């Protein structure tokens, strides 16, 4: 019964999110568009989801075309809404900003609507990732059994509202996920895998078992106090740097989806200055500051697991 209730809440929360998004988009369309600039990125094809991105060619869209793409993007939740060649495992990204004229009465209404949408998105994600009690690999099948074709990352992704920005500049951010581990924690993880033998493409079951045993021995041979860490690169992300003249401060936002800028003309706010997003080229990335890295030796490549020398 509890599992049935969870599925019911999964579906109910998602339908509420869909309705809230549709209503919000209709509300935005009633407001005057001041300026819009979004940047479409090449689609990620099936089988290319995990390939490193060395170059990204950006296409710019302005005005009502940009607005149309942005509003459609907010409601892009299913693979049926995209090319059949595009991967369903990679979320669609559309950095940029759409700016609308608001006043003292309409701004709080729009902000409240976005707050409600984001609450539903976070509740939906919590149902899938926490309340389901399922491991990561099993969640995909569970969600798609009840919501076939759902792009879960698009469903999780919240909307970002900004108020009266003076300037917006776009760029790219390179990051790593870093997690420190103890030797015994890694051994426990490998031991768990050894006790549930399976085949992992392109290895047979026996080959995979032998590979795990070698990895186990490699870790077991390390001193107990060895410093281990997972250092996994995250795909380059579009970001927006927003300058607020009144507060004299800059705020950086992740920008996988268009920012929604509300311009309150009652307060004398004007149309912001919006920069462009340049093509990404990994070979020409310049770091403002790159600290001296700790010497690390890769010990289990598939886990991005390193040991400090």
UniProtKB/Swiss-Prot annotation:
GO MF assignments: DNA binding
Q: Name one GO biological process term.
A: DNA replication termination
What is this protein's name? DNA replication terminus site-binding protein
| Recorded GO CC terms | cytoplasm
- UniProt family annotation: Belongs to the Tus family.
Q: Name one Pfam family in it.
A: Ter
Q: Does the keyword Cytoplasm apply?
A: yes
Q: Which cysteines are joined by disulfide bonds?
A: none
Biological source species: Escherichia fergusonii (strain ATCC 35469 / DSM 13698 / CCUG 18766 / IAM 14443 / JCM 21226 / LMG 7866 / NBRC 102419 / NCTC 12128 / CDC 0568-73)
Keyword terms, alphabetized: Cytoplasm, DNA replication, DNA-binding
Q: Where's it found, cell-wise?
A: Cytoplasm
Keyword NADP applies: no
Major location (coarse): cytoplasm
Q: What does this protein do?
A: Trans-acting protein required for termination of DNA replication. Binds to DNA replication terminator sequences (terA to terF) to prevent the passage of replication forks. The termination efficiency will be affected by the affinity of this protein for the terminator sequence.
Domain of life of the organism encoding this protein: Bacteria
């Amino acid at each position: 019964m509890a599992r049935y209730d969870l599925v019911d809440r999964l579906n109910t929360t998602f339908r509420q999110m869909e309705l809230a998004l549709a209503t919000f988009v209709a509300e935005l369309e009633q407001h005057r568009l001041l300026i819009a600039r979004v940047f479409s990125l090449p689609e990620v094809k099936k089988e290319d989801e995990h390939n490193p991105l060395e170059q990204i060619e950006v296409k710019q869209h302005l005005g009502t075309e940009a607005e149309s793409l942005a509003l459609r993007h907010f409601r892009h939740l299913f693979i049926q809404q995209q090319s059949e060649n595009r991967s369903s495992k990679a979320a669609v990204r559309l950095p940029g900003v759409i700016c609308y004229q608001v006043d003292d009465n309409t701004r709080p209404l729009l902000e409240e609507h976005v707050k409600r949408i984001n609450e539903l998105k976070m509740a939906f994600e919590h149902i899938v990732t926490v309340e389901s009690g399922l491991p990561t690999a099993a969640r995909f099948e569970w969600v798609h059994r009840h919501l076939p074709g759902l792009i879960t990352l698009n469903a999780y992704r919240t909307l970002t509202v900004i108020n009266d920005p003076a300037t917006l500049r776009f760029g790219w951010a390179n990051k790593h996920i870093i997690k420190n581990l103890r030797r015994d924690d890694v051994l426990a993880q490998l031991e768990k895998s050894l006790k549930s033998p399976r085949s992992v493409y392109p290895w047979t079951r026996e080959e995979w078992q032998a590979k795990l045993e070698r990895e186990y021995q490699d870790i077991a041979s390390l001193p107990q106090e060895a410093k281990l860490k997972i250092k996994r690169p995250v795909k380059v992300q579009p970001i927006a740097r927003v300058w607020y003249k009144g507060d004299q401060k800059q705020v950086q936002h992740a920008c996988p989806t268009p920012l929604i800028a509300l311009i309150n003309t009652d307060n004398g706010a004007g149309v912001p200055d919006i920069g462009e997003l340049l093509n990404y080229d990994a070979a020409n990335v310049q770091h403002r500051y790159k600290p001296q890295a700790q010497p690390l030796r890769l010990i289990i490549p598939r886990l991005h697991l390193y040991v400090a020398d």
